[in-house]
Structures are given as C-alpha cells and as structure tokens.
Amino acid sequence: MLFKKKVIMAVIMSVVASAVAVTVYFTWFKPSDFKPQWTDSFIQLPPPETLGTMSVEEAIQRRRSIRSYTSDPLSLQDVSQLLWAAQGITDSARNLRAAPSAGATYPLEVYIVVGNNSMTGLADGLYRYDPHGHRLEHVLKGDLRSSLAEAALGQTWIKEAPINIIIAAVYERTTARYGERGIRYVHMEAGHAAQNLYLQATARGLGMVVVGAFHDDQIQELLRLPTDQKPLYIIPVGHPRS
C-alpha cells in the first residue's frame, strides 16, 4: 500500500512539474501577451518597405552620429521604417522581431516623442510603438522635447530634433529566465536595436545620435513610464543640416 501511495505521489508531482514547465515556456515565449497599458487611441503606421535603395554595406559605410537637424518634418513612412527596424515583427508565425533577443523574451519598449509641426500626419506628444499591430499608441499630448532635453543634461539636439525615439526595458522579462545575467542580455539587445535604427536612418537619408546621458528618474517621471520600465536610450532623429 505504501509503495502504491509513493507511485501515485510521484506521478502527481511529475504532472505538476510538467504543467509548470509548460506555463513558464509560454510565458517566456509569447511576447504578444504584453498588452498596451494606457489608452485605446491608436494610429496605424503604413507597412514597412523591405526593399530599399541602399545596400547594407553602403549604410554601414555612411553611418555617422548626427546632432544637427533641419526643421523639415518627418513622414509617417519614416517613422514606420525606423520603428520596424528597431522592434518590428519580421516573422509573424513565431512573433520574431527585427533585433535579436535572448530567448525571444523581448524586454524592450519603444516610444517616440514628437515635436510641434515635426511630422506630417502626427500631432505632437508621446507615443508607444506596438510591434504586433505596427501602430502607435497615443500616451501623452504636447511637445515634450524641451523637458526631455533638460532631463538629459541640456543636450540641445534633443530639443531641436523633430522626433526622439526612447528605448526602455522591462528587465524582468529577461531576468525571469536568465537571472542576473539577463541584465547583460537586455543591454545587448538595446544595442542591437539602436544599430538597426542607425542603418535604417542612414538608408533613408536621416540623421540620428544615441544618447545615454540623462537623469533616469526625471525621464521616467516626464514620460510617465510604468515602474518596471527603465529608460536606456534617447535617440534624436531628423534630416541632417549639412
């Protein structure tokens, strides 16, 4: 009798362990479960173009950090291409994105700060990029560039650029699987996304620079980021002045 009880308990524990493993697997590998957190106001972006006029080699050769921009507005297609290059879906069957991610945990959240009269077809404000719908979620109204620049130690190119792309991260999406080493993976992924942005901007005749010098708490408060999202990059983008 005691032996039978032990066998039954072993079977039960095996089933429970399998259920937990399956639950964890689908928690880690279903980035589509990350739902928008603020509003139902979405702006659909035009489909990204996958056949450009500049080769990867030429984009690498031409890539530079640009800090001076004209006042010419960006188009929705420009923003569509940039956000797709950073975090867009490139394999809808498996929810894979343009930038590689450790274990497909996808910790990054991407936003854009749009200035007044800085884009055709898009009002000033803060928007969150939804990769699965390839659309923008309107989060905040108003031109936040001056406040953003102030929180970034007064770097004027942030205020002068038509738009600023913000890359933030939810570390727990990756550290839940990889522990402390996941922090490194998150930072690597942010670099992958930023390099994609550089090359896409270059291919479209745009200029940008990555900024890492800012007060984290001020950026978090200004953009009203959820407490689990930490800002990693501010990236001003515009038409190069020269």
Residue ranges and their predicted role:
Residues E160-P162, Q229-K230:
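Short coil/turn connectors at secondary-structure junctions
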Residues R224-S242:
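A glycine-rich helix N-cap at a beta->alpha junction
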Residues L126-R128, N164, I234-P236:
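Conserved hydrophobic/aromatic beta-strand scaffold that supports enzyme active sites
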Residues E49, I167-Y171, H239:
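Short, small-residue-rich loop/turn micro-motifs
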Residues M9-M13, A21-A161:
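N-terminal amphipathic, basic helical "cap/leader" segment at the start of enzyme domains
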Residues M1-M9:
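Short, low-complexity patches enriched in S/T/P/G
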Residues R63, L82, V110, I163-R173, ...:
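Small-aliphatic-rich amphipathic alpha-helix that forms the alpha element of a beta-alpha
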